[in-house]
A protein has these predicted regions:
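Active-site Tyr-X1-5-Lys
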Residues: 1-26
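Amphipathic alpha-helical segment in the mid-to-C-terminal domain
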Residues: 69, 100, 160-161
Length: 172
């Protein structure tokens, strides 16, 4: 879409400015960030699970990349300090991938809610996605794939210290 296109154009411009000025410029694209102070869809999911209105997600075997905010900070420091990173683009993940159901279950555990043994059937989400392009977008954000490789970042020596499986109540 237009957002992705303009973001990419801005990245290219920044890299060009860095190259021509001799300034160290690197781009870090974080995957879905979780941890203290993080806002957005994960915060909404957590609040919905806590209050009991978030639907139990089906296991659709999708894959999503994530990174803890503390690990993202370490990745940013590494890229800023390592001369090899100059002029490069990196993707920051914890190196694992999770299904939306696994994310849902991790949040249930963090807020001390029993993990339901049932889920809303995927066909219900499929029907909802037919209602409008906005609903299709929301369902895809929830159940679609967003899985990326951080091998390039790892080549600088980055290794995430946290994973979603170790998430606890101090992460929110």
């Amino acid at each position: 879409g237009i957002y992705g296109k303009t973001k990419r154009e801005a990245e290219i411009k920044l890299l060009e400015i860095g190259y021509h000025s001799g300034m160290h410029v690197s781009i870090v694209r974080p995957s879905l960030v979780y941890g203290p102070g993080v806002k957005g869809n994960l915060q909404l999911m957590q609040a919905g699970i806590e209050s009991g209105w978030f639907p139990p997600l089906p296991e659709v075997n999708n894959r999503r990349s994530m990174i803890h905010v503390d690990d993202l900070v370490q990745a940013l420091i590494l890229v800023a300090e390592d001369d090899r990173a100059n002029g490069e683009i990196y993707i920051a993940t914890d190196g694992e991938s999770y299904s939306s159901r696994q994310i849902y279950e991790a949040f249930c555990s963090v807020v001390n809610k029993a993990i339901p043994q049932w889920s809303v059937p995927k066909v219900i989400f499929d029907i909802v996605s037919l209602m409008s392009s906005r609903m299709r977008y929301k369902v895809n954000k929830l159940l679609g794939d967003e899985c990326y490789s951080s091998k390039k970042l790892q080549s600088l020596g980055f290794k995430a210290q946290r994973s979603l499986r170790e998430m606890n109540e101090t992460d929110f």
